[in-house]
Amino acid sequence: MKRLALTTFAALGLMAGAAAADPVYGMWKTIPDDNGNFGHIQMAACGSKICGTLVKSFGSDGGEISSDNNGKKIIWDMKSDGGGKYSGGKVWSPDRDKTYKSRMQLSGSNLKIEGCVLGICRDGGIWKRVN
Protein backbone atom coordinates (compact mmCIF):
# COMPACT_ATOMS: atom_id res chain seq x y z
CA MET A 1 0.00 0.00 0.00
CA LYS A 2 2.83 2.40 0.87
CA ARG A 3 4.56 1.57 -2.41
CA LEU A 4 1.36 2.37 -4.36
CA ALA A 5 0.95 5.69 -2.54
CA LEU A 6 4.59 6.65 -3.17
CA THR A 7 4.33 5.67 -6.83
CA THR A 8 1.14 7.70 -7.21
CA PHE A 9 2.68 10.79 -5.57
CA ALA A 10 5.83 10.44 -7.69
CA ALA A 11 3.75 10.19 -10.88
CA LEU A 12 1.71 13.25 -9.90
CA GLY A 13 4.90 15.15 -9.19
CA LEU A 14 6.29 14.28 -12.62
CA MET A 15 3.07 15.38 -14.32
CA ALA A 16 3.08 18.67 -12.42
CA GLY A 17 6.71 19.23 -13.36
CA ALA A 18 5.97 18.57 -17.03
CA ALA A 19 3.03 20.98 -16.96
CA ALA A 20 5.14 23.68 -15.29
CA ALA A 21 7.77 23.34 -18.00
CA ASP A 22 5.72 25.01 -20.76
CA PRO A 23 7.95 27.80 -22.07
CA VAL A 24 5.06 30.27 -22.48
CA TYR A 25 4.50 30.39 -18.71
CA GLY A 26 5.66 33.57 -17.05
CA MET A 27 5.13 37.32 -17.31
CA TRP A 28 4.56 39.10 -20.63
CA LYS A 29 4.33 42.80 -21.55
CA THR A 30 1.53 43.58 -24.00
CA ILE A 31 1.73 46.09 -26.81
CA PRO A 32 0.15 49.49 -26.07
CA ASP A 33 -3.59 49.78 -26.71
CA ASP A 34 -5.25 52.65 -28.61
CA ASN A 35 -4.73 54.89 -25.55
CA GLY A 36 -1.06 53.97 -25.12
CA ASN A 37 -1.74 51.82 -22.04
CA PHE A 38 -0.17 48.38 -21.69
CA GLY A 39 -0.15 45.57 -19.19
CA HIS A 40 1.74 42.67 -17.69
CA ILE A 41 0.06 39.32 -18.29
CA GLN A 42 0.89 36.27 -16.14
CA MET A 43 0.64 33.14 -18.32
CA ALA A 44 0.03 29.94 -16.37
CA ALA A 45 -1.75 26.60 -16.40
CA CYS A 46 -5.52 26.66 -15.98
CA GLY A 47 -6.33 23.00 -15.63
CA SER A 48 -5.08 21.32 -18.81
CA LYS A 49 -5.11 24.59 -20.78
CA ILE A 50 -3.17 27.87 -20.62
CA CYS A 51 -4.53 31.23 -19.54
CA GLY A 52 -3.19 34.72 -19.05
CA THR A 53 -4.25 37.14 -16.31
CA LEU A 54 -3.67 40.89 -16.28
CA VAL A 55 -1.65 41.52 -13.12
CA LYS A 56 -0.39 45.10 -13.65
CA SER A 57 -1.50 48.01 -15.82
CA PHE A 58 0.64 50.90 -17.07
CA GLY A 59 -0.15 54.28 -18.61
CA SER A 60 1.37 55.67 -21.78
CA ASP A 61 4.12 57.29 -19.65
CA GLY A 62 5.15 53.84 -18.35
CA GLY A 63 3.94 54.49 -14.81
CA GLU A 64 1.81 51.88 -13.07
CA ILE A 65 -1.89 52.76 -13.02
CA SER A 66 -4.95 51.38 -11.27
CA SER A 67 -7.29 49.39 -13.52
CA ASP A 68 -10.56 47.58 -12.94
CA ASN A 69 -9.21 44.98 -15.37
CA ASN A 70 -6.35 43.88 -13.09
CA GLY A 71 -6.97 40.29 -12.05
CA LYS A 72 -9.11 39.52 -15.11
CA LYS A 73 -8.34 36.80 -17.63
CA ILE A 74 -7.09 38.19 -20.94
CA ILE A 75 -6.34 34.79 -22.50
CA TRP A 76 -8.02 31.48 -21.72
CA ASP A 77 -8.54 27.95 -23.09
CA MET A 78 -5.24 28.08 -25.02
CA LYS A 79 -3.58 24.74 -25.77
CA SER A 80 -0.06 23.94 -26.87
CA ASP A 81 0.28 22.47 -30.36
CA GLY A 82 4.03 21.95 -29.88
CA GLY A 83 6.89 23.79 -31.50
CA GLY A 84 5.99 27.07 -29.80
CA LYS A 85 2.51 27.19 -31.38
CA TYR A 86 -0.69 27.60 -29.36
CA SER A 87 -4.31 27.59 -30.50
CA GLY A 88 -7.92 27.02 -29.53
CA GLY A 89 -8.05 29.86 -27.04
CA LYS A 90 -9.73 33.20 -26.65
CA VAL A 91 -8.24 36.65 -26.14
CA TRP A 92 -10.11 39.61 -24.65
CA SER A 93 -9.21 43.14 -25.69
CA PRO A 94 -10.10 45.32 -22.68
CA ASP A 95 -9.90 48.64 -24.55
CA ARG A 96 -12.42 47.41 -27.13
CA ASP A 97 -14.27 45.04 -24.78
CA LYS A 98 -14.23 42.38 -27.49
CA THR A 99 -13.32 38.70 -27.32
CA TYR A 100 -11.64 36.94 -30.23
CA LYS A 101 -10.63 33.38 -31.05
CA SER A 102 -6.88 33.37 -30.65
CA ARG A 103 -3.64 31.68 -31.47
CA MET A 104 -0.09 32.42 -30.35
CA GLN A 105 3.44 31.77 -31.60
CA LEU A 106 6.36 31.74 -29.16
CA SER A 107 9.83 32.60 -30.42
CA GLY A 108 12.45 33.20 -27.73
CA SER A 109 11.34 36.21 -25.68
CA ASN A 110 8.60 37.16 -28.16
CA LEU A 111 4.99 35.99 -28.11
CA LYS A 112 3.00 36.80 -31.25
CA ILE A 113 -0.72 37.12 -30.52
CA GLU A 114 -3.45 36.88 -33.16
CA GLY A 115 -7.16 37.44 -32.74
CA CYS A 116 -9.54 35.84 -35.23
CA VAL A 117 -13.13 36.63 -36.22
CA LEU A 118 -15.00 34.65 -38.89
CA GLY A 119 -11.76 32.95 -39.91
CA ILE A 120 -9.93 36.23 -40.50
CA CYS A 121 -6.98 36.63 -38.14
CA ARG A 122 -5.62 40.03 -37.16
CA ASP A 123 -2.16 40.64 -35.81
CA GLY A 124 -2.48 41.42 -32.11
CA GLY A 125 1.15 42.37 -31.83
CA ILE A 126 4.19 40.84 -30.24
CA TRP A 127 4.36 40.66 -26.47
CA LYS A 128 7.77 40.73 -24.79
CA ARG A 129 8.82 38.51 -21.90
CA VAL A 130 9.28 40.36 -18.60
CA ASN A 131 12.27 39.13 -16.57
What are these regions (language model features)?
Residues 7-15:
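Bacterial N-terminal signal peptides
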Residues 22, 36, 120-122:
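Short coil-to-beta-strand transition motifs
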